[in-house]
């Protein structure tokens, strides 16, 4: 957190080494890691003030040594504080009521030190400073001493904002948390409450705030505005009315709206105009489209009149105009990025440039309805991570870093059945330029050949699966498959096919077998003369004109392989598998050789690039993904609209009477089946009673 906040502040401060870092860690290993990380990130050691100690027991900063801390203590205030203290930590509050950090607000309870950490940080904040602290939700509503502290913080206008975070965003705990933003001096008395609990994406077992979520939170904080189902600017009077309870759901309802269901549409069909009207934002953006899709069947209900909803939307004039307007708004954007990033590559400040480009994107999309600007920011941010890393290397190592290649190190197990791993080299990779990008631009033919081969390998694998699934149970029991019956055993397949081919005969095969029984040259030559129908020229002959045994056996096998077994026979399937295995084996060898050649050629290409080509590749790596990603945003709008309309159409497509007809039809079919059953009197009485429940009386009654 220290590194991130320092980097964010540095873009607004001219000069280097202008930021001092203060931190205190209770655990020694964390303390050591903190110092090491700060130094490794290039922060001047003179600007690092990190101590191993108990923050709640000993105020920090600043005293010279533990022995003379009372005599040498000097209050140090900072401009910004960020912290994530242990949640609801136990502590010793004894005699802490006289501690200057707590005496104006109160002392946190023994079992929960959350407010103790908060007050410690607030105490060290400059009058114009700002602090953020991550806390459990309980600090917002718990009573007792915590309520007293919370009330004082509110009455003194210290609380700027409260941000509810998604659950499970921190490793090791699923506790829902908040960020509380505080200032020592504020001119406003209201509190901005943000519910960002639904702003996340799944990342394994945890949830993760996306760049777009963080940006939306920050923008809302800066604007201090209420946003439906997301944020509310709450007055101090409202907080007083709620008895200083700051529990987020009291002020912000972020729950999803319940889906409406119209009883008339359920019974008679048709789509309520009220539900069509709920898509008003789309109808405003695409004039005339509603009338193109829907036709009224009464004053209050309509139906879909378009044969194909997706085509009707995509081909409508106002939709086409909308897409054209969007793309027009980004005219010259790629060139602008190139000027900012590529032309000034050694001096560009990635952090400040990102903000400028973000503002540019927002300005370009401001007048384009329905465009999610935060989705646009996410596209920029995801690609900017790569750009920032590359710029850091180029600016730190020099322009020649672009022409470097590095060993591609991967972690592998030493032995398959052991957990011990080792790092080994698997080929090479570009230091800056990805091999795949270079190959696509300069070695497209070679790359295409490899990709085609790999696609064929996938086809072969799918063909194995198809053949496996076609086998009967007794066929699977043979040795041609492995123990799990999910793959063929090459050796066994070949043996099976060889055995099956043994009985294959033809005049030429029989003649060749007879030829193999001959021992003397004159007999062999005579046999060749006497049997001209044999394709002797298809075999390589010895110097004396005879044909050797290997060549004859190969020809016999070739002729036998030409034999067609019945298509669905096991012999035909195994013959197909054997041929596929031979093709697969040969293809893997070819692909391996092609990859080795392509890698060597790629390395040579990167090392010998001219400056113009190098910069063009950077443009393709950095700028093209941003431009193409932003280009998809209007398509996302159209896709969302089509989905909404299709859902409406299917929602009321089946009426209650339709369901009843299907139900009666199914009941009739079932009753016919029941009537055909025979059994004991008790069974038949039971079935008769069952038919009553289905609305059908026993004919005997």
Model-based region annotation:
Residues 1-80, 88-92, 99-105, 109, ...:
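Conserved S-adenosyl-L-methionine
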Residues 3, 90-94, 132-133, 142-147, ...:
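Extended hydrophobic-aromatic, low-complexity segments
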Residues 81-82, 131:
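Hydrophobic beta-strand segment of the Class I
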Residues 109-182, 652:
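Conserved Class I SAM-dependent methyltransferase catalytic core
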Residues 171-268:
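Flexible, glycine-/basic-rich loop-and-beta segments that form/coincide
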Residues 245, 253-261, 269, 273, ...:
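Polyanion-binding catalytic cores of nucleic-acid enzymes and NTP/SAM-utilizing transferases
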Residues 284, 290-608, 612-700:
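Terminal accessory regions of large proteins
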């Amino acid at each position: 957190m220290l590194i991130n906040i320092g980097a964010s502040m540095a873009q607004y401060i001219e000069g280097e080494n202008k930021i001092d870092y203060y931190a205190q860690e209770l655990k020694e290993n964390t303390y050591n890691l903190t110092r090491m990380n700060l130094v490794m990130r290039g922060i001047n050691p003179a600007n690092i003030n990190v101590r191993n100690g108990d923050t709640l027991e000993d105020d920090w900063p600043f005293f010279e040594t533990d022995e003379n801390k009372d005599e040498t203590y000097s209050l140090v205030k900072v401009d910004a504080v960020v912290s994530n203290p242990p949640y609801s930590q136990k502590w010793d509050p004894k005699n802490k009521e006289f501690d200057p950090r707590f005496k104006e607000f109160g002392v946190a309870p023994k079992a929960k030190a959350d407010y103790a950490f908060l007050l410690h940080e607030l105490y060290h904040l400059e009058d114009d400073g700002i602090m953020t602290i991550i806390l459990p939700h309980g600090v917002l509503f718990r009573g007792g001493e915590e309520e007293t502290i919370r009330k004082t913080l509110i009455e003194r206008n210290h609380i700027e904002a409260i941000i509810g975070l998604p659950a499970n965003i921190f490793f090791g705990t699923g506790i829902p948390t908040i960020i509380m933003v505080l200032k020592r001096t504020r001119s406003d008395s209201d509190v901005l409450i943000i519910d960002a609990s639904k702003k996340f994406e799944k990342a394994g077992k945890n949830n993760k705030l996306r760049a777009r979520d963080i940006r939306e939170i920050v923008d809302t904080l800066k604007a201090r505005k209420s946003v439906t189902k997301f944020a509310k600017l709450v007055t101090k009077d409202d907080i007083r009315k709620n008895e200083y309870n700051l529990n987020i759901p009291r002020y912000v309802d972020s729950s999803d709206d319940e889906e409406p269901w119209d009883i008339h549409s359920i019974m008679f069909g048709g789509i309520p105009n009220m539900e069509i009207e709920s898509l008003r934002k789309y109808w405003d953006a695409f004039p005339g489209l509603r009338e193109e899709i829907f036709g009224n069947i009464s004053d209050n209900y309509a139906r879909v009149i378009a044969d194909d909803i997706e085509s009707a939307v995509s081909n409508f004039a106002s939709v086409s105009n909308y897409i054209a307007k969007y793309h027009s708004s980004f005219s010259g954007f790629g060139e602008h990025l190139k000027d900012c990033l590529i032309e000034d590559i050694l001096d560009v400040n990635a952090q400040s440039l990102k903000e400028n480009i973000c503002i540019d994107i927002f300005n370009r999309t401001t007048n384009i309805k329905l465009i999610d600007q935060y989705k646009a920011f996410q596209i920029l941010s995801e690609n900017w991570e790569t750009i920032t890393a590359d710029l850091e290397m180029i600016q730190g190592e020099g322009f020649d870093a672009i022409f470097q290649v590095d060993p591609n190190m991967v972690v592998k197990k030493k032995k398959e059945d052991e957990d011990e791993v080792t790092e080994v080299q698997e080929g090479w990779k570009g230091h800056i330029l990805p091999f795949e990008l270079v190959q696509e631009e300069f070695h497209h033919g070679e790359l295409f050949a490899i990709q085609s081969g790999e696609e064929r390998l996938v086809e072969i694998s799918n063909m194995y699966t198809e053949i496996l699934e076609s086998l009967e149970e007794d066929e699977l029991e043979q040795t041609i498959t492995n123990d799990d019956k999910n793959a063929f055993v090459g050796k066994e397949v070949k043996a099976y096919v060889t055995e099956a081919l043994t009985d294959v005969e033809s005049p030429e095969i029989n003649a060749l077998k007879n030829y193999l029984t001959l021992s003397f040259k004159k007999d062999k030559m005579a046999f060749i003369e006497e049997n001209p129908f044999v394709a002797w020229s298809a075999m390589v002959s010895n110097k004396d004109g005879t044909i050797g045994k290997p060549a004859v056996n190969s020809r016999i096998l070739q002729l036998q392989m030409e034999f067609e077994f019945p298509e669905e026979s096991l012999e035909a399937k195994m013959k197909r598998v054997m041929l596929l295995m031979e093709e697969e084996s040969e293809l893997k060898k070819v692909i391996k050789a092609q990859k080795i050649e392509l890698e060597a050629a790629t390395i040579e290409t990167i090392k010998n690039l001219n400056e113009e080509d190098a910069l063009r590749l950077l443009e393709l790596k950095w700028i093209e993904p941003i431009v193409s990603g932003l280009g998809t945003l209007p398509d996302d709008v159209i896709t969302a609209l089509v989905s909404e309309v299709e859902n409406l159409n299917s929602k009321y497509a089946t009426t209650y009477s339709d369901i009843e007809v299907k139900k009666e039809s199914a009941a009739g079919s079932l009753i016919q089946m029941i009537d055909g059953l025979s059994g004991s009197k008790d069974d038949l009485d039971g079935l008769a009673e069952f038919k009553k429940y289905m609305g059908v009386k026993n004919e005997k009654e």
